[in-house]
Amino acid sequence: MGEVKKRSLFSWLLFDLANTVYAFIIPGLYFSVWLVSEKGWTDQQLGLATSSAMIIVAILGPWVGKKSDSSEGKKKLLLTMTLLCIISTFLLGTFSVEISVLLFVISLIGFNLGSVVYDALIVSVSNNDNRGKISGLGVAFGYTGSLIGFGVATLLQNNGYSYEEIFKSVALLFLIFSLPAFFFIDEKIVSSKKIKTSILNSLNIVIKSWKHSRQYEGLTRFLVGRFFYADAINTLISGLLAVYLVEEVGLTPADSQNILALAIVVSIIGGYIFGKLADIYGPRKLILTSICCWIISLSLAIIATEFNQLWLIYVTGVLGGFNIGGIFAVDRVFMTRLSPEEHLGEFYGLYSTVGRFATILGPILWGLIVNTLSLSRNVAMGSLIILLVISFMIIKDVSDKERF
């Protein structure tokens, strides 16, 4: 690999590190705890805030993806969405709680639309023979970013800094680690066409993209299956896992952070190992294995709280962490096998739409069970297991042979 290629790959990996700092610290941990435990908002209100952002992302994702397939390329769009996320994150806590929730929603929109473009850039830094390994490295770098963000945030909190100052530090970390991507990624432009389409036409693009996806064997079925496992996983990492550990399990915020830190460490290993194995055995087997491990992990969490076996929470953290790194390393590879390169941005838009609609349904379902029906969070956790079983049944028959 030449010097420019190495620089391009490293810059792409650093961006995964940068945006995972945000994903783990803001929606995954500190903002959710700040909102529920410090400001008195409910799980349902947090879920509705997250879901409102995901509705917008689900509608705009295919438009952004299709736009990124044009001759204008992906990096300009990535820069725009990244700055939207960074600026709104920097301002969290500066104004009223309501304004902060609005800024949180905006930051989620920028982050998730940027991820559509970033994921599609994998074809610029990899080939068919090493794409699983590269995707796994991206996940490993990403969760290394979580460790960096967690370390900085914990250091600041232990030294008396406020949540608001932690939010600002995350925004600055995102900015610093994302900068190389905009200068050094050697983007592979597949299309020579300019795509002129209004953002107001987004819903029409979503419909056309879904119809288009049916032309490629297994793609639509995989996306539907992904909806269900992403629903379960994204519901937890949207912040409700941190709330679950504190409010249901009874851990202190410090103890819950230690478990999440442990999960991050093993997710780095999981992402790399699953990525390497995907190049050998194919992504389908690895995704199915990961789904099974998630079912076991969530079942152990329920057993741990119902029978007061808190040591099992650490087992859950290790198993869940290993597999969250694994499943997100492998499903990117699955997408590239099912999609032609010239439409990769468009179909990653659908991939994002599926993930975001999953993030809409999951928190709403969780809030309905916990706040409306007044059932325990363990019942909500059980509902996520059902979603994982459905996902397994859908994906098990999708072929992952290389097509393009």
Question: What does each of the following model-derived ranges do?
Answer:
Residues 1-9, 188-224:
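Juxtamembrane intracellular "pre-TM" segments in multi-pass secondary transporters
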Residues 2-54, 218-259:
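Helix-loop boundary and gating motifs at the non-cytosolic
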Residues 48-66, 261-273:
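Central cavity-lining transmembrane alpha-helices of secondary-active solute carriers
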Residues 60-73, 270-283, 370:
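Helix-to-loop junctions at the C-terminal end of transmembrane segments
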Residues 79-97, 293-307:
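C-terminal ends and interior cores of transmembrane alpha-helices
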Residues 113-126, 326-339:
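Intracellular juxtamembrane helix-capping segments at the cytosolic ends
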Residues 133-154, 352-362:
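Glycine-rich segments within core transmembrane alpha-helices of 12-TM secondary carriers
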Residues 156-172, 368-388:
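A membrane-interface helix-boundary motif in multi-pass transporters
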